[in-house]
Amino acid sequence: MMNEKWGSGDPKQSLTDLTFAAYDDHHYIKYAGLPTTKSAYLQEACTTDRSGNWPVFVGEWSLSVDSSVENTDDWKPDHDVDFYKKFWAAQVMSYEKTAGGWIFWSWKTTGLNDPRWDYQMAVDRGIIDRNPDTAYDVGAC
């Protein structure tokens, strides 16, 4: 069920038993209304607290950035692999610290050709390491 951070009321009000229940949080920093600077994105990723209701898992997230800059040269993943490595690592660490874990938007997309939404492509392009534990070695936060 959706976490209280969705702002749609008490997700437990209609449930009589919470055994085996967990909350799902979809967190897309792309839509956070941040200043379009890489430091603002890293700051948000490093400090976000997704805890709210417990247990919660971040069941959807990506490396996408605001639509106004996502296709500019400065923000294209192939032009700044280092930023996207840090952006990925910061989110992984935050979601593992303040939630019960995470699930990236998609393992593989068709036709999109954007590693910000495609985990396998991000691995192939060197943005995400094959071993997700390396997030703690990137020095993102």
Predicted regions and their residues:
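Substrate-binding cleft of secreted/luminal carbohydrate-active enzymes
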Residues: G52-G139
